[in-house]
């Protein structure tokens, strides 16, 4: 699910998105360095097997080709970490699930990762904090 902070509008009273960090500039540098030959495919195609599994089974396919292999479409996977959640976080698969987490947990951080299931490219796309004021 390509989660954005706007998806939480109406998640319940007291839900507040504290800000967003976009990692596009860092991504562009990595892709540029790969294309210049300064980074190898092994350097940039290193997705953990669990991230690949999540991308294939619950990730949202985008219209964007993988910037490394240029053969597959990039998939988006969202993870949430915070109080009252498992240490490994929760892979969020719907806006409704995210809204429920936002209502019940005190403070959360959501990480949105782009993944290529073919070549294992992965990069953090954005992150944002969510707080629940009672």
Predicted stretch roles:
Residues 1-49:
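N-terminal alpha-helical interaction blocks
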């Amino acid at each position: 699910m390509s989660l954005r902070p706007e998806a939480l509008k109406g998640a319940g009273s007291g839900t507040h998105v504290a800000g967003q960090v976009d990692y596009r500039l860092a991504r562009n540098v990595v892709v540029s360095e790969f294309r210049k030959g300064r980074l190898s495919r092994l350097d940039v195609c290193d997705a953990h097997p669990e991230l690949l599994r999540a991308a294939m089974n619950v990730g949202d396919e985008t219209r964007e080709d993988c910037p490394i292999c240029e053969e597959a479409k990039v998939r988006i996977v969202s993870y949430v970490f915070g109080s009252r959640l498992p240490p490994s976080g929760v892979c969020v698969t719907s806006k409704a699930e995210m809204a429920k987490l936002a209502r019940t947990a005190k403070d959360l951080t959501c990480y949105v990762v782009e993944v290529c299931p073919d070549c294992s490219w992965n990069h953090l796309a954005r992150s944002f904090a969510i707080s629940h004021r009672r």
